[in-house]
A protein has these predicted regions:
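Short, hinge-like loop/turn segments at secondary-structure boundaries
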Residues: 4-5, 27-29, 111-113, 147-149, ...
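Residue-level signature of catalytic and energy-coupling elements of molecular machines
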Residues: 50, 95, 131, 160, ...
């Protein structure tokens, strides 16, 4: 604080429910009251942050330093917010946290995510629940069977941030719990054979050799994710990885990213082509501005903002409507 005198007010992340009062007090104004969240992400879908912070110690990540350890929000509070968002028109809630499978552990809950989903299932008007993100360490058959049995409310589309596939690199990343990503994927597909999987990967982590990258690329080609994101490693100041030797040149990082993204583009195209001639529910989000009978939406394996959109033709469709097309 002393080193940043230009900062007028520090607001702890754990006290977000008090930010309004604190800001008003700092400005010498009265606080009008009311803490209902306003839906700003679109008329059909909303993000619901279920926890703050992270208990994992990945060496490339600064989030635990910035946001502290896991701090789960109470179920009652989340159900109230969910009800408010649905009342404003949201039909899909995207549960977000650094690790949604970890939800409730700091509150002494053994099956926190399951309890939360069961509580949210009572919210009238809610059609879909989507989970972002499931850390590999939390992926087990007990949870997967629950998610399978919670369909169609919980869509069988999961983002599992693996970050890499080679066990040596995963260990160097501080992710020994994820040393066998093949096993993680096999566990999911054993319980949910039709699940859509997406992941995020880091290329060019310090010490990543050509053999490590070739292993990762083969993994992507064999697993065939519906979608994935690839990020060149960035040396975040204050993280252990930033001081590691064997830093990979930027040009090599970018080239490796392009190679995997090229592989994934072909995989995603093949998966989408396999959907031709099938019917599935489309969550309508908005009309096309140029064609009055064309509407933009998403199917169950398309997460908001990152996995593309689906267009459906019709008359008088409304945002938030589920259309079987």
């Amino acid at each position: 604080t002393a080193g940043l005198p230009e900062v007028d007010l520090w607001l702890p992340l754990a006290e977000q429910d008090q930010w309004g009062e604190r800001l008003a007090q700092a400005l010498g104004r009265s606080f009008p009251g009311g803490r209902e969240r306003i839906l700003t992400t679109g008329p059909a879908s909303a993000y619901l942050k279920i926890s703050e912070g992270c208990d994992h110690a990945c060496r490339f990540c600064i989030i635990p330093q910035l946001r502290g350890p896991l701090q789960s929000r109470p179920i009652e509070e989340l159900v109230r917010e969910a009800g408010s968002l649905v009342a404003q028109g949201a039909r899909e809630l995207v549960l977000v946290a650094q690790d949604v499978a970890n939800y409730g552990q700091d509150l002494g809950m053994r099956q926190g995510l399951q309890q939360l989903v069961e509580a949210l299932s009572a919210v009238t008007g809610l059609d879909w629940i989507r989970l972002l993100y499931l850390y590999p360490v939390g992926v087990n058959k007990e949870l997967l069977r629950f998610l399978r049995d919670s369909a169609p409310l919980v869509v069988p589309s999961f983002d599992i941030p693996l970050q890499h596939a080679h066990p040596d690199i995963l260990t160097q990343m501080g992710r020994p719990f994820a040393r066998d990503p093949y096993r993680v994927i096999a566990t999911v597909r054993d319980v949910l054979p039709q699940a859509a999987l997406r992941t995020s990967l880091i290329v060019g982590y310090p010490g990543e050799k050509e053999a490590h990258f070739a292993y990762l690329r083969q993994f992507v080609q064999e697993v065939r994710f519906h979608n994935l994101g690839v990020f060149p490693y960035y040396a975040e100041e204050g993280t252990p990885a930033a001081t590691l030797p064997d830093q990979v040149p930027e040009a090599v990082k970018n080239d490796r990213r392009e190679q995997i993204m090229g592989d994934q583009a072909q995989i995603s195209e093949t998966i989408l082509e396999s959907c031709q001639g099938t019917t599935m529910d489309v969550l309508v989000e908005r009309p096309d501005p140029h064609w009055p009978t064309l509407f933009q939406g998403r199917v169950w394996f398309q997460a908001p903002e990152v996995d593309g959109v689906t267009y459906v033709s019709g008359h008088g469709l409304q945002a938030g409507q589920l259309v079987h097309a």
